[in-house]
């Protein structure tokens, strides 16, 4: 994979899917599949082969999934694959989008299909004012050319889409925006939720400790979310955990805390951690590292929790 920027598993943990940030050949990026002989153990992976890849060809080499791809998710039933794009240039107007590919059987990405010209299968330009401004996450006061989509996730019913923007340059900052889809997983029905959203970075404030956000994931019950970043200084290679008062609603939340990713055996904490996901049990967490092109696996002592003192009682699980 070229610069892995997203990771996901099937529910059984026997398949791992990796998104390449940029194409190795041709015009479009791709998603690769690996088989795991031991569920959720990435050390047991074997490459499924080029024939099992999903080439992200939507027929548009100008605003399609060609490069700067970030994050991948599946619909709750595994019949839809989603990928995000967010350019890294100084002017990425019309660059931030989410794309949907349909599958003929659950988690079989070799069958991925994008009907050319279908509005259902791609968001409109997420850099438009009406999809960026007016929420609790704040309004960017300069032209929307440096928002930089870096992650996304859906509610279980497919009617909420959460998009993580890393931001770049003066007056741009990391934000999590919440969108409503009036039809489940229909990306053409998108609208911003103005009474929700989280501003994740605010001039180095300890209350919003996320700089250069790079990945997003929600717990299955929608009551927690995590953001990975690899900014500089105090923002270096961290994961922030946020609890939501209402499932899959960012209108009211608590920042539980932030942990620095531990150093691995070779002394590298993952210079460029980006994609983020968990095992079905919540006892393993995974990040991609697009600097060294590998996947890092972490064991957790509490399901879907990385902050000391925030593990729920057994009866709550």
What is the predicted function of each stretch?
Residues 1, 46-64, 113-144, 191-208, ...:
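Surface-exposed loop and turn segments in beta-propeller and other repeat-based domains
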Residues 1-8, 63-73, 137-153, 207-217, ...:
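Signature of short aromatic-glycine-proline-rich micro-motifs recurring in repeat-based ectodomains
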Residues 11-12, 76-77, 156-157, 220-221, ...:
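Residue-level detector of Asp-centered blade-edge/turn motifs that repeat once per structural unit
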Residues 19, 84-86, 164-166, 228, ...:
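Residue-level marker for isolated small/hydroxyl-bearing positions within beta-strands
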Residues 22-27, 87-93, 167-173, 231-236, ...:
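Short glycine/acidic-enriched loop and turn motifs that connect beta-strands
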Residues 33-45, 100-112, 178-190, 241-252, ...:
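Short loop/turn segments immediately following beta-strands, especially the blade-tip
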Residues 275-310:
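Blade-level signature of beta-propeller repeat domains, shared across WD40, Kelch, NHL, RCC1
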């Amino acid at each position: 994979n070229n610069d892995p920027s997203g990771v996901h598993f099937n529910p059984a943990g026997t398949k791992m899917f990796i998104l390449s940030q940029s194409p190795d050949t041709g015009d479009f990026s791709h998603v690769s599949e690996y088989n795991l002989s031991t569920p959720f153990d990435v050390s047991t992976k074997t490459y499924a082969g080029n024939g099992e890849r999903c080439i992200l060809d939507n027929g548009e080499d100008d605003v399609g999934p060609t490069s700067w791809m970030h994050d991948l998710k599946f619909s709750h039933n595994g019949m839809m694959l989603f990928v995000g794009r967010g350019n890294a240039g100084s002017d990425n107007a019309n660059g931030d989008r989410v794309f949907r590919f349909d599958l003929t059987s659950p988690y079989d990405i070799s069958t991925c299909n994008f009907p050319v010209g279908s509005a259902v299968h791609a968001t409109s330009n997420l850099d438009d004012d009406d999809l960026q401004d007016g929420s609790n996450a704040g309004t960017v006061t300069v032209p929307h050319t440096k928002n930089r989509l870096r992650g996304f996730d859906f509610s279980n019913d497919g009617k909420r889409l959460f998009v993580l923007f890393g931001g770049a340059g003066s007056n741009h900052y990391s934000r999590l925006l919440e969108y409503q889809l009036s039809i489940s997983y229909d990306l053409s029905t998108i609208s911003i939720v103005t009474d929700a959203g989280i501003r994740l970075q605010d001039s180095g404030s300890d209350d919003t400790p996320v700089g250069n956000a790079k990945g997003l994931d929600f717990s299955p019950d929608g009551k927690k979310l995590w953001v990975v970043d690899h900014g500089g200084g105090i923002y270096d290679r961290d994961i922030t955990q946020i609890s939501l008062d209402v499932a899959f609603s960012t209108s009211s939340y608590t920042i539980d805390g932030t942990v620095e990713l531990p150093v691995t055996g070779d002394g590298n904490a993952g210079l460029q951690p980006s994609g983020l996901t968990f095992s079905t049990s919540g006892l393993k967490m995974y990040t991609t590292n697009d600097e060294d092109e590998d996947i890092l696996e972490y064991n957790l002592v509490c399901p879907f929790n990385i902050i000391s003192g925030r593990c729920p009682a057994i009866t709550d699980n």
